Amino acid sequence: VSGSLLLNIGEALARHIDDPDRIKYYAQELKQNTYNLTRMNLVMRGIKPDNIVTRNADTLEDDWPYFEDNDPENTYEPLYLDAVVSNPPYSQKWDPTGKESDPRYARFGLAPKSKADYAFLLHDFYHLKPDGIMTIVLPHGVLFRGGEEGTIRRNLIENNHIDAIIGLPPNIFFGTGIPTIIMVLKQKRDSTDTLIVDASKGFVKSGKNNMLRAGDIRRIVDVVAARADVEKYSRLVSRDEIRENDYNLNIPRYVDSSEDPETWDIYASMFGGIPANEIDALSPYWEAFPGLRGELFDVQPNGYAQCKDDPAAIVNGHASVLEFEENYRRAFDGFGDFLHEHLVSRCETVKVSREENLLTQDIFTRLDGIPLVDRYAAFQMLHEQWTTVSLDLEMIQREGFDTIRAIDPHMVVKKKNGKDQEVQEGWEGRIIPFDIVQKTLMPEQVKAVAELEERLEQAQFELTDL
């Protein structure tokens, strides 16, 4: 670990409690440099040293009992946690010799010596409180491999501990292209089914890797929290069905996320016209805009359709489209005032860790009843802006309201004598960019400057032609 998993789970918990200092962080790491990095990252993010308990040790060989280092024998007691997160090395070799009676593994079985994935999982699970939750990142093989792993998987299912399985996009972790899943486990559950989620299609390319966007993550979280069936994305699977599949949890057995095959209409390709099934495929739009389909297409006697002239004008002027736009505007009436109240009027006291979720819920509520709009695309737009807004709010709360008026040197990197050097190039607002101030307080002057710059550009263009 380097601390990122701990920080993420800590931030998530902080949204639901009044005092983040109540959160205590435990971590164990084998590599000395990573262990040091973990402690440093936690301290740098404002975690109090008293709330950090880390050990530099082998997790599989040295279980984590809670004891005082100077007197381990007399201060031993098991450690049980509210939340456990883990991203162990994949399919690492280990030595299970003599561990049959280890309380971490005794209930479920020993992982094979060639693959320690389930050893890490059972270690984490042992330290979970009865009402706690655990998530662990693992390779797909843990879902279907047989032998000792199949026995452990069966025991976990029969004891009703596997809450959800989430298939992730490939190549999202640096240093490995191994496809991975997140397994969610609980000690006690009210239901006996397992939620299977195939989130492998939700990502964007980022260099050589794939990256989960905030909207992709939010979609996963909402589906898991609601335990929702979503076509081509997630399904609640009964324990009986898993038994029928011999405890094989391979995601494609339960969720088909494949794209519909592309089809070609030979008649339309040869003689023209739009096949009715291709128009039917746009049914969400026809439901959202009643009457628009009939206005856009003329159906020929042969059953194929022709698009009428100037479809853009038909769409933009159609009554159902105008009604849709009005409903959308009405849904967001007062949104600016809502933002002003939450972020501007209370900028010195707002709970930054909770505010994004409050804004998200408000946007989702406004979008209820508005078809076609992807709420997770809206969330992605909010999140991209929130990254800057939250930093500004934290700075105002840390430095005081006057920091809004502060300006800082605008530093840029320029070449000097063949070397990159950082030099000052004017000034910039610490919180509020100059262009916002100018457009808000001096709109006429900004307009005049823009007109002069346009005239200057035109004059230079004319001089070039002479």
Task: Label each residue range with its predicted role.
Residues 1-83, 91-95, 102-106, 119, ...:
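Conserved S-adenosyl-L-methionine
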Residues 2, 32-33, 60-61, 89-92, ...:
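Conserved nucleotide-binding/hydrolysis micro-motifs of P-loop NTPases
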Residues 18, 26, 35-36, 40-76, ...:
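S-adenosyl-L-methionine-dependent nucleic acid methyltransferase catalytic domains
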Residues 84-85, 134:
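Hydrophobic beta-strand segment of the Class I
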Residues 112-185:
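Conserved Class I SAM-dependent methyltransferase catalytic core
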Residues 174-271:
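Flexible, glycine-/basic-rich loop-and-beta segments that form/coincide
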Residues 251-283, 422-446:
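Short, exposed interaction patches on small structured surface elements
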Residues 286-288, 293-466:
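Terminal accessory regions of large proteins
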